[in-house]
Amino acid sequence: MTDSFPFSVQESVPLSRFSTFRIGGPARYFKELTSLSEALTVFSYLHTHPLPYIIIGKGSNCLFDDQGFDGLVLYNNIQGQEFLSDTQIKVLSGSSFALLGKRLSSQGFSGLEFAVGIPGTVGGAVFMNAGTTLANTASSLINVEIIDHSGILLSIPREKLLFSYRTSPFQKKPAFIASATFQLTKDPQAAKRAKALIEERILKQPYEYPSAGCIFRNPEGLSAGALIDRAGLKGLKIGGGQISEKHGNFIINTGNACTADILELIEIIQKTLKKQGISLHKEVRIIPFRL
């Protein structure tokens, strides 16, 4: 079947290797993207040859099914960056967001310090409007390049894109995020702020276990982690999955968790908080075996 593609693909690639949860069965087809020209070829093909597909970066916000994915998984590894001016930088979407924040802050640039604690790609950060209490991705974003459903590269200025808390227009109107351009400022204190942020995260979050980061979005004016803690759910374990004792909004893989373990814990949290009149909405992407 792989011979029918006009580009190279792999079969039966374990998705657990591409998930920070370390959970997931095999992808029916798997394609690593390493250049924009390659991505244009792939999306032009998919426009005329319908096939279920998903796009992943570092898999830091995904929960794959134990059966895997019955379609094509596109792994975005398109990396690179260039300064367009003294304080504007264009970054390809497969680049590490955390490394970008660390590198820029160490060079005295402010605007992306918060990225040092976000373990995804630039494309994933734009898709989720990832952020912290300091800022979010949209705060310094000035332009996004996408490949649309027909395989055409488009450039969209920030003012034409509606972002909100952990939400971007790309969640409802799928497109391949090719690059993002950010506006920075020069600030010698940027590195100090970035260092303080990562130290705080290491102290408060369970980095020693595989996870997908925060499972739920914070309700307006509230902390999901604090709500889960007050509900007495921290430490609850099902199979190999556990609600972290360190941070209530993290579900961790203690070594042999399966998708069902994580989903059951998510359901318990939601039902428990619902009884208190609080609705928690998932931040993590649940990717089923079949779309």
UniProtKB/Swiss-Prot annotation:
Major place of residence: cytoplasm
Q: Which Pfam families match?
A: FAD_binding_4, MurB_C
- Enzyme Commission designation: 1.3.1.98
Q: Main EC class of this protein?
A: oxidoreductase
Which reaction is catalysed here? Answer: UDP-N-acetyl-alpha-D-muramate + NADP(+) = UDP-N-acetyl-3-O-(1-carboxyvinyl)-alpha-D-glucosamine + NADPH + H(+)
Q: Which cofactor does it need?
A: FAD
Per UniProt, the keywords (alphabetical) are: Cell cycle, Cell division, Cell shape, Cell wall biogenesis/degradation, Cytoplasm, FAD, Flavoprotein, NADP, Oxidoreductase, Peptidoglycan synthesis
Compartment annotation = Cytoplasm
**Which part of the chain is the FAD-binding PCMH-type domain?**
22-187
- UniProt function note: Cell wall formation.
**Protein family according to the UniProt entry:** Belongs to the MurB family.
The name this protein goes by in its record: UDP-N-acetylenolpyruvoylglucosamine reductase
Q: Which gene encodes it?
A: murB
